Amino acid sequence: MKLLLDSHVPAGVAAAVLKLQSSWSVEHVSSWQGGGWRNADDDLVLDACHEDRRVVVSKDRRTLPGWVALRASEGKDHSGILFYDEDRFPARAIGTLAKAVASAGKERRAWKNSWVTLR
């Protein structure tokens, strides 16, 4: 499983997920590919993640669904999105969020064009 944690996700979640699933590739956008994607628009990040077969982890329900809808209208796929709610997973709950991400990743095999909300 390959994950990209977007800028809204605490960077420490990457290491916490890797402790649970050491065979996965988990990157934070601030350091992924030398940090070049840190300030990139969501549509470009979705393109790059799709090319890399990397699922995006985000709490950004304000703009990301719009980009996904636009991609779909253009016939473009995405590699999947794991959404989470900050009320359920506050920034200080890194371990709890990491466990939920790992659990969702183990339960689901096909991520293409899907999104899952962590509970």
Labelled PLM ranges:
Residues L4-D6, V55-R61:
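Acidic beta-strand-to-loop metal/phosphate-binding motif
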Residues D43-S58:
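Short, structured active-site "lid" loops
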